[in-house]
Amino acid sequence: MPRERGGGGCWLLPALLLLPPLCAPALAISVAAEDAKEQIERLVSQESEKSGKSNKINIELQEIVFVIQSQSNSFHSKRAEDLERNILKQAEELGKELPRVLLIHQMDRHDGAWTILPLMHDFSASYGRNSSWIFFCEEDTRIQIVKLLETLRRFDKSKEWFLGKALYDEESTIIHHYAFAENPTVFKFPDFAAGWALSIPLVNKLANKLKSEPLKSDFTIDLKHEKGNGPHLTPVPEFCTDDLNSYKAVHCATMFSNFLPVCGDPVKKEDIFVAVKTCQKFHRDRIPIVKQTWESEAALVEYYSDYAETSIPTIDLGVPNTERGHCGKTFAILERFLNQSSSKTPWLVIVDDDTLISIFRLRKLLSCYDPNEPVFLGERYGYGLGTGGYSYITGGGGMVFSREAIQKLLASKCQCYSNDAPDDMVLGMCFSGLGIPITHCPLFHQARPMDYPKDYLAHQIPISFHKHWNINPVKEYFTWLAPKMEDSFTEKKQRRIREDL
């Protein structure tokens, strides 16, 4: 598949199948026990008055299988387990039989389980006869169980339903392979943060279809945009991404707040080493943008090129520039970090020369990760996941490595098959072979702000964007990523400013 050539050496993969989720920032897992109990009792009472059949809740609760799109990294697995406990606690407060709750990362027999489709056969075989709904949610999705039951009751469970909060592209975009170019707004796809549901008849149909028609695309780029010939998404207003404390939340079955996680003090500036991939032909137009925007946020930054220029300065790694891939350059950066940087520097970030990034926010995010674990963090894509492939971090949005991950990688002797091999994909293949899962964070972005639905970005505090073409990159940086935004505006004001641009 052709890949669009990126700046300092990364590529943007045009999508045939189109990513999901998840790093998932901080959100309180539960309300105080007494408040939660009172709220549930009130909702149950209201529901009983409406239907006159209190037993209906029991039956329907047992018919829902909750699937949390979790990850195996210790930070994420704990968040998913907290959500699982919250779901079960709500069910227990109702005094009913506990529902089934599944965590994606525990389904380790499926390397591509996060893409959901490989699990359809198992869902159909295990739950096709005794369940009505598969409900998917992210680690930070918050669920009002009674309200969810009330919402699903509106839909005939014997029919094929695909339910969620609808997103759409206002303009055709490369991350969705310019799908529906004439009018991209016609295709609606779910915001995973709000949760989404498939009725069992649709699950069974998909399982049968995938048996006879295996996935045709090698690449998984934006899972929430994947599409087929089945039922279109039915928008459900009760599936929300409003904050728990919002006045709108009272009407919501689900809520979500993707605030930046704070797990302690932000990591120190000196704990992050930033490597910028560039080449001589971009020294004059791209490097000045870096210096006008995020460079001052980084205490340790070096520019790696095919030409040493003291005025920047750039470092020639002895790897010739290539027209595609840049794997040789990336592995040379990894070697240099391990052998020449201070052994006390726990984190390495590799970005392209046209990546816009907030080091300020990254420092907060990394407070949630243990640098003693092998961490490989960024925006997740997939290659050949239906046929034994692997996941990888797409380079344009930034690739974050713990020192431990780099040590294990280089000790394995896994390497580029050529200097111009796609670096991000080779890294994904190497880490997969080592049994080290990549960690996905939706706050890293391979494309520009305009390439994502406004409503999707509205519940994010982004860490990076990529590409300078057809935008003013300095303006985009100060609109979306500059540190002063946290100091000057509330999240609500940020959202209003962004929507007005």
Language-model segment annotations:
Residues 2-501:
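Secretory-pathway lumenal glyco-enzymes, predominantly type II signal-anchor Golgi glycosyltransferases
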